[in-house]
Amino acid sequence: MDYTTLTTQDPLQNYTESALASTSEDSEFLYGLGGENSPGHYGGIVSSRAVGGFRHSPVLQTFPLHWPETSAGIPQSLTTYGRSPGTLPLYPSAASALGSITSPPLYSATPFLLGSAPLAERDGSPKFLETLKTERTSPLTSDILSLEPRSPSLLQVGYLGGGGQEFSHSLFQSTEDRECVNCGATVTPLWRRDLSGHYLCNACGLYHKMNGQNRPLIRPKKRLIISKRAGTQCSNCHTSTTTLWRRNAGGDPVCNACGLYYKLHNVNRPLTMKKEGIQTRNRKVSSKSKKKKQLENPFEPPKTGVEEPSPYQYGPLLFHGQMPTMGHMLSPPHHFLQSPRMSHSTPAVSYRYSASGVTPPELA
């Protein structure tokens, strides 16, 4: 199929596609590639009734355009081409047919183009310097866009959406390199300040606020609160450290151990029982006692010495109707639920249940 370009002498004819014709009052952008006299790259919104234009369906059927090799551009009068559509300039300059176009210019996002400008319009060219003066901000993006000529075949990513919001680098960094002046911590859920304005971590700040002094750096070990009185000694064992000071019948101060011993036995505590350390009730349970408690079974029936080992441990304590109710406690295998088969030579053992408990077995 041949594509015929429009010269400046011929009026712009209505060109519609039969299969893709649109009946709405659509407006199209007209792109032009020309020399110095023709506009570099603009789009005029032209009504289909006022001036004949190129009408087609919303599916844009465009072909890639090539840049002019020189700054002079493409000649105004062009002939019919028989080449492939990819080598044709789709919209030549039609400024003389349309007259002066006062529509707002079409912005092209320079940073987002997937191509580069022609070599003739780079640094040093007066046209390139003009484009730098006419930079403005696009209403869709916050980036600075220039009005230099661009090919419509190139993908203009700037029109696909608004420009990305620029975040300051400080938002992705932790707060200033702060350090607690007391403990040296650099990470804390909340920074606080002391009276002099220095940074404190949350723990040190709360401690200083509650106690009025700096938080101790070394965590003290958990120890008993020992009551110390200057010059106070037990009248019995003559110790000066105890968890609680008591008084004997005569009103003299005694330590906790001597006071309890006298309270229980009405006799003074012998000096041989004096110990250097203070024994507390927080005694650790030995591992042996733990194992014994685990091995002991509270549901095990008392053994009389005559019973045979039952295949099911809880059999003697359970009636037949109680098995479903204790299903959450016992999950024996299916073959254990059946009564064990006894040999003919072994005498059968019968159990009698009474209100008082299990009676000794009787041989049949």
Curated annotation (Swiss-Prot):
Is Cell wall biogenesis/degradation tagged as a keyword?
A: no
The lineage's top-level taxon is Eukaryota
* Entry's localization field: Nucleus
Q: Where are the zinc fingers (GATA-type)?
A: 180-204, 234-258
Q: Name one Pfam family in it.
A: GATA
Chain intervals for the UniProt region annotation (Disordered): 273-318
Indicate, by first and last residue, each region the UniProt record lists as having compositional bias (Basic residues): 281-293
GO cellular component term, pick one? nucleus
> Would I find Signal among this entry's keywords?
no
Sorted alphabetically, which InterPro entries does this protein's record hold?
Transcription_factor_GATA, Znf_GATA, Znf_NHR/GATA
Q: Which SUPFAM superfamilies match?
A: Glucocorticoid receptor-like (DNA-binding domain)
Q: Which UniProt keywords apply?
A: Activator, DNA-binding, Metal-binding, Nucleus, Repeat, Transcription, Transcription regulation, Zinc, Zinc-finger
What tissues express this gene product?
A: Expressed in the developing ventral blood island, and in both tadpole and adult erythrocytes.
- A single MF term (Gene Ontology): zinc ion binding
GO biological process, any: cell fate commitment
Main location as per UniProt: nucleus
Q: What does this protein do?
A: Transcription factor that acts synergistically with tal1/scl and lmo2 to specify embryonic dorsal mesoderm to a hematopoietic fate.
* Matches recorded under PANTHER family: ERYTHROID TRANSCRIPTION FACTOR, TRANSCRIPTION FACTOR GATA FAMILY MEMBER
What name is this protein filed under? GATA-binding factor 1-B
